[in-house]
């Protein structure tokens, strides 16, 4: 059968389930897909199909992730669910599955548990902008006061990690009842309430093409009689012929003008997010630009050397290091298109980092990189990946 054409009539939003092991993330994922498929069309998913998440690779790291799609009246959602805690850590840090918002699943019977806290912290560190809470297994709790207590605990935990705990939507329900076809308040009604919260609480994300222009430099050529051409894939925004741009990172920032946009050897008036292009730069010498820099809208992004990051260090089985590393470890940090050496400062209570750990670190690079919070990077030793990370906070 021919693949059906993807009709994009509704805005698209990426979400995912997070929370403690056995609190019902996968059951809820199945329940959402099943209830919404019956209401708005789409494919219902069984628990087993989601639980048997296929392996995929992101930045050389193997992650098990299940991808489920569903629709509401207003939107199309792509939803990720991971079977194991380690998969969540890797997924969130590598940005393999970018989330515009997360559904935190918390069992009403147990309340917040260690991974509940850890996933909220991770969401904060990697820049997941919105969290909605699904208080699951409410059918197992008869005491209304107990429910209220759990809700309060969850709100406090969210506030502790700088999410708006008091204003976060909390939906009470039972994913199991909903999946079994229960039409009551805790069943189907709760899922519809959750869908409504997704639609109203998570804003429609900005499309890449609407962002400010940014293109990582992949290659630089000099074409006699025309000048210097820089090639790369436009990450976001639009570049028009005649616009002023900046070259940022590694060396002092310089301004130049884009005098031509080429794609597949054709001249264009403009290039936009997703295009692989060559940009002709006025008065720029070939030796003035190098891989690892970015071209961007003037003033939109600054070069930095000092930042905190959340990192996952590959285990030995994943092809990572066989031994721990200590304070002042100096690997290469691969940002976008190039490696820059940097030194790692560990948190005070952490003497060493073992392969397979995730940890918050402070990094000082030997050369500045065009950087924003949320930027992903790989940690490498002699060209092989030993870790993955995300910029949590820029220090200077």
UniProtKB/Swiss-Prot annotation:
It comes from the Bacteria. Residues 19-26 are annotated as: G1. Residues 60-64 are annotated as: G2. Residues 136-139 are annotated as: G4. Mg(2+) binds at residue 26. Gene3D superfamilies: P-loop containing nucleotide triphosphate hydrolases, Translation factors. Its EC number is 3.6.5.3. It is an enzyme of class 3 (hydrolase). It catalyses: GTP + H2O = GDP + phosphate + H(+). Residues 174-176 are annotated as: G5. It is found in: Cytoplasm. Residues 10-206 form the tr-type G domain. GO terms for cellular component: cytoplasm. It holds the Pfam family GTP_EFTU. Keywords: Cytoplasm, Elongation factor, GTP-binding, Hydrolase, Magnesium, Metal-binding, Nucleotide-binding, Protein biosynthesis. GO terms for molecular function: GTP binding; GTPase activity; guanosine tetraphosphate binding; translation elongation factor activity. PANTHER family: ELONGATION FACTOR TU, MITOCHONDRIAL, ELONGATION FACTOR TU-RELATED. HAMAP family: EF_Tu_B. Monomer. GTP hydrolase that promotes the GTP-dependent binding of aminoacyl-tRNA to the A-site of ribosomes during protein biosynthesis. This is Elongation factor Tu. The lineage of its organism: Bacteria, Pseudomonadati, Pseudomonadota, Betaproteobacteria, Burkholderiales.
